[in-house]
């Protein structure tokens, strides 16, 4: 089977994203392929993460609320249908990417499963209710453990091509 992996992280703070890098790399290593990320544009990740070899592409999405919630779901459905991902990993509790992935027919939708999100996931492995009290990094650690994905390093690393500076 050809893996085409997408990882969704909806928080807009760059620091929170940086702390997710070890988990993103672990998922890439687990599937032995580069991954695509869907992130908020406010992170400026396309500039900051461009030299990481395990990241193939970064797509920006707004992850808005209210009326725009459904516009963003439709945008995600279009992305998922175009890219034909085999797996979508959601590294937080949001429903939007899980709903879009389910509508798009993605077979492997994996996330922490807090609240209503578990209705849209294709796995029956969810974080425990008390894991809600963990920080984002610890929640991602637990999610990877649940799915037998080996974490090689707890600390983030950003590669920078100094010739391009």
Predicted regions and their residues:
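Catalytic machinery of carbohydrate-active enzymes
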Residues: 1-165
């Amino acid at each position: 089977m050809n893996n085409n992996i997408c990882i969704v992280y909806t928080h807009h703070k760059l620091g929170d994203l940086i702390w997710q890098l070890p988990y993103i790399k672990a998922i890439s290593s687990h599937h032995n392929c580069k991954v695509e990320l869907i992130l908020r544009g406010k992170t400026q990740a396309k500039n900051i993460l461009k030299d990481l070899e395990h990241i193939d592409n970064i797509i920006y999405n707004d992850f808005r609320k209210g009326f725009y919630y459904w516009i963003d779901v439709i945008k995600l459905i279009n992305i998922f249908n175009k890219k034909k991902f085999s797996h979508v990993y959601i590294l937080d509790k949001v429903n939007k990417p899980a709903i879009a992935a389910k509508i798009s027919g993605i077979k492997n939708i994996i996330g922490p499963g807090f609240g209503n999100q578990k209705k849209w996931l294709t796995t029956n492995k969810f974080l425990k209710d008390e894991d809600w009290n963990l920080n984002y990094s610890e929640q991602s650690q637990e999610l990877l453990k649940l799915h037998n994905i080996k974490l090689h390093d707890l600390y983030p690393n950003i590669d920078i091509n100094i010739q391009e500076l």
